[in-house]
Amino acid sequence: ESRLTDVLVDNGFVQVATPTIMSRGLLARMSIDANHPLSSQVFWLDDKTCLRPMLAPHLYYVLKDLLRLWEKPVRIFEVGSCFRKESSGARHSTEFTMLNLVEMGLELESRESRLNELAALIVEAAGIDEHELQTEESTIYGQTIDIVAGEGRVELGSAAMGPHPLDQPWRIAEPWVGIGFGLERLLMVAEGSESLGRVGRSLAYLNGVPLNI
């Protein structure tokens, strides 16, 4: 995590820290209402708040003000825990760490090349030799560009570009690129592990070594 943070700061990004508790209203701005497929995966604390299932809504909230206060392009990132009632399996966890980076206010025609640069920057800093970009359908963004690597082509992160319809509730109209990486998945592929449990937050493992030996 510290290596990725240092690389982003060295490349002009500013780290932000937003609350772990998120309001229902902010999720609704991302089109996640009671009928959305992701809603059933959310850990609701009460009728109005939940443990954040993603970082994006809070980053939108911060960006709408930074676009007014800072010169463009605005470059920020956040590293933080997210929570979802994910399907079981070696590559899923109910608590996981996301790294989201956003560059907003860049030239429209440079978005794709910049996205490639930023994906390579993080993947290489994580110690992963090669990766691919694949276009995938998304229940939130409509379409994303997934970064995959390793045996079995593990999804390391998902990227999107704007302007995007989800920008409208925030009155944002700037071109942007953003990527959300799963830190545990980056570590899993970098270390050649087959299980997220060995590299994530755990009571059973320390630095990938089982404690019940």
Explain the meaning of each model-derived region.
Residues W44-I213:
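A translation/RNA-centric and nucleic-acid-associated enzymatic feature enriched
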Residues E1-S39:
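TRNA-binding/sensing appendages of the translation machinery
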